[in-house]
Amino acid sequence: PLMCRVAGELCDGVHVHPMHSMHYITNRLLPQVAKGASDANRNSSEIELMIPVFAVAGDSEEERDAMKARAKTQIAFYGSTPNYAFQFDDLGFENIGPTLNKLMREGDLNALQATITDEILEEFAIVANWDDMADKLIARYQGVASRIITYLTAEDIGRNPKNLPRWGEIARAVTS
């Protein structure tokens, strides 16, 4: 909270961590940025939010599987630390943080990833068909994000170069 208040007081923008839910942005981040801005006699609407998003695209479950697994692993990794684990509790997924922390210490990466259910993934990522991805990004972040960064996209393109034009279409749709 302190750094969000400081950003509200002093900064032109905030680069949000990819491990976020809209609940976190709405109920934790934005109020603190607004408090800092108010303390400095600034308007918080002038502070830009750059938001990396775990975006998992594909026209079939099979096509999305690799990116879903990667996003779940990242969410589990970040969520295993106290700095991010509270977000699970905020969403009603109690005791996920301590479970992830224990599994991380044990080095059980398969169980770590399996702890992040599809329901949890949907809170921290956008999972969609290619044709729906831009609309889902816009629906979730319009009026909140100044910029969206699709996290893990470079990795996806590295695995599947044919996806580059599709990610380009999404970027154009989101920025238009």
Regions found by a protein language model. Name each.
Residues 1-176:
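Active-site-adjacent structural elements that line small-molecule/cofactor binding pockets in enzymes
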